[in-house]
Structures are given as C-alpha cells and as structure tokens.
Amino acid sequence: MRKNLTEIVFILDRSGSMSGLEQDTIGGFNSMIKQQKNAEGEALISTILFDNVSEVLHDRINVKDIQPLSDHDYMVRGCTALLDAIGGAIHHIGNIHKYARREDVPEHTMFVITTDGMENASRYYSNNKVKQMIEWQKIKYGWEFLFLGANIDAVETASLFGIDEDRAVNYQCDSEGTALNYEVISEAISAVRCSVPLGSNWKKRIDEDFKKRGNRK
C-alpha cells in the first residue's frame, strides 16, 4: 500500500435540475481543488459528471495537474442516472486497485457523491447492486463514501446504497449551500489525506445550514 497517497473520486450531478447553479458548482469545485493542491501528501483525482449518461472528466489525475473546471466542462442537461455513475466508478477504480501492485494501491480511497434529485435514468446498475459494491469496498478495503443530497432525503437515499447515516447529509440547493458544500468537502478530504478519523461532525456545518435556512421556506 502506498502511504500518503489518496484516491479521490467525485461523482457530480449535472442533470437539468442543476440549472442556475453552474457557476457556483464550478467555482466551488475549483476552490476545493486549489486547496487540495496545497495539502499534505499525494492525491489522484477522478471526476465523473452525470446526467442520462456519465462523462469521465478526470481519470486518476495528480491533483497538482488538475486544470480549473470551466463552463465548457460543466453544462447541465438531461435526467439523473446516479446509480450508473456510482456503479461504473466503483467498478473502474476497484479493477485498477485489484490488478495494481500492492505497493501502488493508494492508502486511502474516498468517494464524494453529490446530487440534487432522485435517481430516474440508470440502465445498468440497481440499488441492490450498488449497495453490494459499496459495502464490499467499505468492509474489505476501508473506502470512504460521502453522500450530499438536495431535494431528497439524503440519509434515506444513501442507506439504499449502503452508505451510513453519518456519511450522508442534506444540503440547501442554492448558491450559498453549494459553496458551503465544497468548503466542507475540502475539509473532509484533508482529514482523510492526513489519516485523521472522519467522525460524524464532518457534516455539522451543512446540517446546521440546512436546518436554519430550510425552516425559512
């Protein structure tokens, strides 16, 4: 196992319901990557954008070589094939680790999944299949999965995929909520990269924001 190397996989919703938040998503993602370029240790970044289909924007790229996300990269459209995006990414990363030399397998692997709506377009993966895949990687290899959801019950939805309650959070799907998401995600990634145990408090700021501002509506 390669010490101080973290595999980070972002699965980002770009379905039509994200319309109006393109610049907030782009800005938040770029700010997070900039912070991670200056963090301790090494990191490989994979970014999967999904709507009806999945697009691999980055495939295990050194974080220091990641170029800023642009509006040409992130254009919203289509429906929400969330399960296919998650299942495909786990299959890809899992196969790479399986056939790599043991000393080349990253010390940590972390998936960050964000969506603002319910699954409605996957063709290849089911809830049960994705749940089996996630639980296997968590138990066998200690992979981390974070799930951030808007306009759904994020905790309940995550549980269908085998993601624990303390790794799921509801967020406000607006400019402020999106910016906060990426701030908190960056903090969580930094903790994992430094081998600091990720407790349930990682999501406290998002929880508080959701409860405070959600009650106004």
Segments the model singles out, each with a brief description of its role:
Residues 1-217:
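Acidic, low-complexity intrinsically disordered regions
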